[in-house]
Amino acid sequence: MTGSPRAPHQEHALGEPTVEGLARYIREKDVRRILVLVGAGASVAAGIPDFRSSDTGIYAKLGKYNLDDPTDAFSLTLLREKPEIFYSIARELNLWPGHFQPTAVHHFIRLLQDEGRLLRCCTQNIDGLEKAAGVSPELLVEAHGSFAAAACIECHTPFSIEQNYLEAMSGTVSRCSTCGGIVKPNVVFFGENLPDAFFDALHHDAPIAELVIIIGTSMQVHPFALLPCVVPKSIPRVLMNRERVGGLLFRFPDDPLDTIHDDAVAKEGRSSSSQSRSPSASARREEGGTEDGSSSPNEEVEDASTSSSSDGYGQYGDYYAHPDVCRDVFFRGDCQENVLKLAECLGLREALAKRMRFSGAAPATARKTSNET
């Protein structure tokens, strides 16, 4: 099965909520503004672990550090106190450029760019594989940063990423030559602001998107998870994942039409185990302030994008005001296989295979693909 079956007498924005129907919709509507949202599931086939898988995820392997919360490993507070923990994790992951190859998902995004159909690719991943696949920097938002550059966390002086890599691999914590502060790759820690490019995408790209394709993410990290909530309510939203995510954010064709969206349901959805990166309540030591207790410059952004926000779930109620049309579709399973199928239906399978052969890309089924980041 390539999609969710439709409820009786229910129309779908794609016409037919299948991979074939999605490809037909893209061709017939000549969709030119596709917003692609990418999570860790897209990179697991390259050999990079995700964060939340119960046995193989990064968080599952942090028990030896005796952390109160696994996300603390990626907080500035712990980095200042015990930088060796982050550097040990970074050394194990080895996400500095050149150590992993893009997967079919990454090359498919590049093909969307080449076809003139990519509005923007927003990725939660810090592995740089979208860039390695040739996605243009102008069309790429690395919302949580990457290992392509490094800087001091105190004075922000740039630091050689090559030196940072060599020192990390030798077991040394990189230090700033200007102020002696700790150096880290330019990845966004919990408690740090996301790049301006993310908010440009949130406020300017998402509202004009014609189609959203969400690949391999748990939809648990905010404000990234807000992106599907602010796209036009008339456009299709496609989820490619091993498991259903997003709670009440989505209504798929096989969902019951009589689902009640009331305050109790919304409250249940909002209380799910979400994480926020901009800034993070868990990373702050005093409520209402930043790490050092000062007022957060992005308090309004936080209020609108953390797990306590109702923005994403309130939109679900709009569907049931118009229950005759469904716009969401869920392609359950390996996101690599689903992307290969979509490429074939779009007539791009040969081009995708050529790109993968040329770049030495990771095989689409090299490893069981995770559903989240």
Curated annotation (Swiss-Prot):
**Provenance organism:** Leishmania major
Q: What does this protein do?
A: NAD-dependent deacetylase, which probably acts as a regulator of gene expression believed to help form modified chromatin structures on the genes it regulates.
Q: Which residues bind NAD(+)?
A: 39-59, 124-127, 216-218, 241-243, 335
* GO molecular function annotation: histone deacetylase activity; histone deacetylase activity, NAD-dependent; metal ion binding; NAD+ binding; NAD+ poly-ADP-ribosyltransferase activity; NAD-dependent protein lysine deacetylase activity; tubulin deacetylase activity
Query: What protein is this chain from?
Result: NAD-dependent protein deacetylase SIR2rp1
**Residues at the active site:** H144 (proton acceptor)
Bound cofactor: record note: Binds 1 zinc ion per subunit.
The family classification in the record reads: Belongs to the sirtuin family. Class I subfamily.
Point out the gene that encodes the protein.
SIR2rp1
Q: What is its EC number?
A: 2.3.1.286
Q: Which domain of life is it from?
A: Eukaryota
Task: Give the catalytic activity.
Answer: N(6)-acetyl-L-lysyl-[protein] + NAD(+) + H2O = 2''-O-acetyl-ADP-D-ribose + nicotinamide + L-lysyl-[protein]
Q: Which cofactor does it need?
A: Zn(2+)
